[in-house]
């Protein structure tokens, strides 16, 4: 039986969650990344997406979706794209990393 695992390492501590669906794992990953980045509203999302490395980028660029209700209505394929865009904003901080893996339940 396939399952998906969301794994995260933050400040040397590891945690993981298991999910029956790929979409569930991606949603958990996006939620964790958004929490790590401190995104709670539209203003936070724009600031983080356009000014994460201390260099203000194009302020007219809209950030990827972050509203949990809207994310839940998307497909796994759409969510992977959003996850990729947000997780890229964590790459400058070597204290945080996360990954989604598919595995099987062994008997």
Predicted ranges, named:
Residues 4-8, 25, 29, 100:
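Hydrophobic beta-strand residues in large extracellular and virion-surface proteins
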Residues 28, 32-36:
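Conserved short hydrophobic interaction patches
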């Amino acid at each position: 039986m396939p399952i998906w695992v969301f794994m995260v390492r933050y400040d040397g501590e590891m945690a993981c969650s298991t999910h029956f669906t790929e979409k569930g794992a991606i949603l958990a990953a996006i939620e964790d990344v958004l929490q790590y980045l401190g995104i709670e509203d539209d203003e936070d999302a724009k600031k983080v997406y356009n000014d994460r490395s201390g260099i203000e980028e194009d302020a007219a660029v809209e950030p990827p979706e972050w509203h949990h209700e809207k994310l839940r209505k998307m497909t796994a394929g759409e969510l992977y794209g959003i996850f990729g865009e947000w997780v890229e904003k964590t790459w400058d901080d070597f204290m945080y990393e996360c990954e989604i893996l598919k595995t099987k339940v062994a008997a």
